[in-house]
């Protein structure tokens, strides 16, 4: 009897439940992918720090705290309270811009190991997934009226020939910013996904 009631309940939802199910599935995939990238970013940054002398770590961290990531030019919530107040569409849009801003710089993170070579393709997959989520919520044309405006300049002169100290600083900056941005995207997508469950507690 319970099984029959359950089947009738599912059937009564009809087609209207399908978009929610699809949305949850897409969000789950996107969150899983950005979690993988965030963990990878943390590992790469930790490995790089471990290769430095204590004084080098201290100096580089001091410089980085006074510097900015390229993605800081992308307007995003300033704290967890603003993040929670932001709409799903806004969080998706910001996440898309953050991921897109790494398409070119991520090439310098590739090479040397299998995990590093996963970065660019994983970013591309994540970008596609977020775009699908945006289109499921609203016409993508309204979110990205001018895609050229989303392109940020490469990270300083990272791609030029640099001295040892400057090269260390650029590598530190690149890895630290990548870790920071993947954490942002993970947070935004997790909150947006939570909004699909009205009874869920989305407190950060």
Curated annotation (Swiss-Prot):
Its main location: secreted. InterPro entries: 4_helix_cytokine-like_core (IPR009079), Somatotropin (IPR034975), Somatotropin/Prolactin (IPR001400), Somatotropin_CS (IPR018116). It comes from the Eukaryota. Disulfide bonds join 69-177, 194-202. GO terms for biological process: animal organ development; growth hormone receptor signaling pathway; positive regulation of growth; positive regulation of receptor signaling pathway via JAK-STAT; response to nutrient levels. Residues 1-17 form the signal peptide. PANTHER family: SOMATOTROPIN, SOMATOTROPIN,PROLACTIN. This is Somatotropin. The gene is gh.
